[in-house]
Every structure is written in structure tokens, then in C-alpha cells.
Amino acid sequence: MNERDYRLDFCRGLALILIFIDHVPGNPLSLWTLRKWAFCDAAEVFVLISGISSYLAYGSKLDKLGFGGCCTAVARRLTRIYGAHLLLFLSAALFVRLASAYFVRVDYVDFLQVKHLFADPRHYVPAALTLSYLPKYLDILPLYLILLATAPAIIFLVKRDPWLALIVSALVYTMVRMTGFNLSAGHDGLGWNFNPFAWQFLYTIGVVVGHFSKVGFKADSLHYRYQWAWLTLAGGFAIFALLAAAPWSGTEESRALFSLYLWPAEKTFLSPLRVANVVALLYLFAFFVPKQAKFFSSRAASLFLACGRNSLPVYGVGVVLSCAGYVALSENDATNMTSVAVNVIGILSLFTLAYVLDWRRKNLRIVEASTPSNYAIALVRRFVG
């Protein structure tokens, strides 16, 4: 029986669509994404899910191949992600350069923060290659590169003592928040928008969740004994975050009061509010939605599942499309028609890309599993049955 947890692919796919929407400045649809209704946004969902997925993907490799074999498997994945980052960097930079040359309303090169690259390529090209130059919107993959590079060590520790792994991660997180230590983004005196030394805490939480999803909890564990208490706590915090952050008309005064002490929950050093909120939301989702719920077999869900299974190309294309969407909105005065077109075309493009990649992967598997004599039969069975 296939025991794949479709919730992971669905949440990752949904997060990628939300990231595209949020990355288009002035996009009216972003008023309805997670970042407007909670302390966290799609980035936290993506990192937490990535931690869970990393354990599920490499935990068994650590057992079978040892630490060295696990590192080798991770290194292969890192190579692909690094290549994708460089391709995305080049594509986005060239796109905004062409847009700035053709249009005059907005300096799109300055918007993406790549003006330094074109002004001094001899310095900034090597900086980009070493991840010491990170323009706007091009910082999630470098974060993921660093987090994934630490995955073998984190998984190794989690398998021996998950609580010790969390304590060590929390100590690093606390020290970074106290000292303000960060890596340089290489321009304008800025640091990384996603400080990896802070965001590793959320990633480690994901790895620990992945561990317990495989080994389970003891019947008398705190998880089962106080399950309804955890559910109440998660639900209560999610409601509190909604009331504090939601942009409802007439709640401006209450939001202003909350903002004095809580909001906006800063992102670079990963505010504890963001951690608590995303963990609460995913706990509620996991509690109420079975991992193979019938909903996941629907056509609508299948589109998000496909995006989740093809997260790297979907994210990269989504960033370029968000730049194109910003150009379209800026050059057409952000009319309602333009806003609808930007979102519909962008989201449908990502769904189509994910669907085509899924279709290609499935048919490659048919070819690999079939001899030339029975390939046609296998293909017919797949589409008929």
C-alpha cells in the first residue's frame, strides 16, 4: 500500500503559489495570502516542510549508507540546487535589465537590487557565485542550500536524541537573536534576509517532526496524554495571530496596539511568533487532514501536489514570473484587469509547468520499467487504467 504523505506535497505546492503572489509588489491578491492573516507566511511553511522532507528523504539513507553515503546523496542534491540558483540569478537579472532598457516608469534593475552586478561585474559575479551577493527575491535557495548541507549532521543527532538536537538548535537560535550575527548580503550594508543561523531552528523542528512521523510516539507519551491540550493550544494561538494580524476594517486600533509589542514579527532573525504560528498551523492541518485524504485525489488538489513534487523549477519560474508581473502592473497603472491577468497567467503557468514535469517523470518511469516490446502496453494501461 502506498503510504506517501500527500500533505507534504500539498503544503509545499501551496506555499510556492503563495510565494509567487507575495513576490509581485502591489499585487491585490497578496491581501489574501497567509502573511496578511498570521504572524508567519509561506516561507516558514516551506522551510518547516523542507525539514520534514529532508528526514524522510535522507534518514533511511543514513541508516543504509552510513554518514558518508548520506553526505554524498545530499551533495548531489546540493549541486542541482546550486545550479538552479545560478540559473535563476542570471535569468532574473537579465529580465529586469531588459525591462529597464525598454520601460522608463520604474528602474527594475534597482528594484531587484542587481544594479551592483551590472555596475561592477568583476567584483559581484564572483560574489554571486560564492553566495556572498544576494539580491532581492534570490535568497531562499541559498538559505535552503545551507540548511540542506547541515541535514546529515542534524539527522544523525536527531536519530540519537531528538530532544538534544532541538536544545542545541534552540541555543544557536537564541545566541544569534541576542548577538545579531548574520551573513552579509554583499550590498548596501545588508545582511541575509533569511539568517540561516536563525532559520535552522525551524528546519530542525521539521527534521524532528519527520523523525517522529516515522518512529511514532509511545502510548504514554506527552503527545498522546495531552493531545487535546496541544490541539487547544495550537488552535488558540492560531486564532490569536489571526486577530492580531488580520487586516479587517475597523480593527486598526487593536492592530496598532498589538504592533507595539508583537507585530510586525521580524523575519530576518525569525521571530518566535513566526515559529509558534507556523508550527501551530501545521499541527492543526496534520490533525484534521489525513495524510491520504480523499481531497488529495481531486483535480484542484492535484495541481498543488504537482507543484510540491516539482518545487525547484516551480519556485525558479515563479520568481521570474513575479518580476514580469511587477512590470505589467507598473506599466499599466495596476488596473483591476491587469491584476487579474497577472495572477491568472502566473498561477496557470506554474500549474502547467508542474503538470508537464509530472507527466514527463511518469512516462520516463514507464520507459525505464518496460522493455521495447511491452512499452506500448504499459503506456496504454497507465492512461486507461
Regions found by a protein language model. Give the residues of each.
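Alpha-helical transmembrane segments and their immediate juxtamembrane cytosolic regions
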Residues: 1-385
